């Protein structure tokens, strides 16, 4: 396998997904698979919800053109296909949370039974003692599947954010696997990025606002499920290339945001799935940043956290228990900012005003 072949495959995936996306958005408008504006959604017009369907089509295309072995490829496509189909039905008809959670659990069970993919160990997060899960690992795996799907679903609040965060996660996993010699799984991660990039271009309006599309629940479900599937492939077993604690850093922002928001809702006596405007992107936008600026800032923060995980994994210098402690400290800092969102927003606004005053009041230098 050489770089020219890999590059050619990735470009082919990108072009195929782009063409499929333009085709799918036309079909979506005819069948009513569109997002309509309401009091929580600020977009205008009917936006096709075909990002996830197009990404899935791109991955099917990937598995069709590549000639290297990807473990459990057929099983993954079947499981992911079911989730994308249910997600598309939810986008169109608004399926209840209980039905979706039941189907996600069923798919998780199929993954564990037929793919033998489940959490058997959490690594050496308590020092020299490996935390082996035993039968409890099956239940924790179902929770991990549900958590990953919902974590990526909840960050899909502003243009580009879901695509940006998912690309960060797949890039981090892909780099670790590539340098470890796990090229097949690494190419799968890079193929996910190639299939997501066309969606980001249309979602951000780079090719024109009239071509705008949304990912939809089908897309966020697919991305979350794919992330947890690849992490289970690579963090478990005797010769795993990624430590379980590194996975936390790779999906840090979506995971932190989900846990912090659900905890906040439960404390208020609300359903953990009830919508609100307390996510990290809402906090940043209340501080005076635009939607595009919030997207860039959050994606860069996710890339920074993922880089910490990648460097620690690659160097083998920092013990796993230390990485867990550092992650928990980062999480508590994140939770503190979310809990005091208005204070943080006011502080950032004051800093921005001072910077503008200092910039405006500085004397012009002349020769």
Curated annotation (Swiss-Prot):
The chain crosses the membrane at residues 3-23, 46-66, 69-89, 106-126, 132-152, 158-178, 187-207, 213-233, 242-262, 294-314, 318-338. Its EC number is 2.7.8.33. It is a multi-pass membrane protein. The record marks 156, 159 as: Could be required for catalysis. It holds the Pfam family Glycos_transf_4. Inhibited by tunicamycin. It catalyses: di-trans,octa-cis-undecaprenyl phosphate + UDP-N-acetyl-alpha-D-glucosamine = N-acetyl-alpha-D-glucosaminyl-di-trans,octa-cis-undecaprenyl diphosphate + UMP. Residues 24-45, 90-105, 153-157, 208-212, 263-293, 339-367 are cytoplasmic. Keywords: Cell inner membrane, Cell membrane, Glycosyltransferase, Lipopolysaccharide biosynthesis, Magnesium, Manganese, Membrane, Transferase, Transmembrane, Transmembrane helix. Changing residue 276 to G: No loss of activity; both in vivo and in vitro. Changing residue 91 to N: Reduces slightly the velocity and shows a small increase of the affinity for the transferase. Residues 1-2, 67-68, 127-131, 179-186, 234-241, 315-317 are periplasmic. Pathway: Bacterial outer membrane biogenesis; LPS O-antigen biosynthesis; Bacterial outer membrane biogenesis; enterobacterial common antigen biosynthesis. GO terms for biological process: cell wall macromolecule biosynthetic process; cell wall organization; enterobacterial common antigen biosynthetic process; lipopolysaccharide biosynthetic process; O antigen biosynthetic process. The keyword Glycosyltransferase applies. Catalyzes the transfer of the GlcNAc-1-phosphate moiety from UDP-GlcNAc onto the carrier lipid undecaprenyl phosphate (C55-P), yielding GlcNAc-pyrophosphoryl-undecaprenyl (GlcNAc-PP-C55). It is the first lipid-linked intermediate involved in enterobacterial common antigen (ECA) synthesis, and an acceptor for the addition of subsequent sugars to complete the biosynthesis of O-antigen lipopolysaccharide (LPS) in many E.coli O types. The apparent affinity of WecA for the polyisoprenyl phosphate substrates increases with the polyisoprenyl chain length. Belongs to the glycosyltransferase 4 family. WecA subfamily. PANTHER family: PHOSPHO-N-ACETYLMURAMOYL-PENTAPEPTIDE-TRANSFERASE, UNDECAPRENYL-PHOSPHATE ALPHA-N-ACETYLGLUCOSAMINYL 1-PHOSPHATE TRANSFERASE. This is Undecaprenyl-phosphate alpha-N-acetylglucosaminyl 1-phosphate transferase.
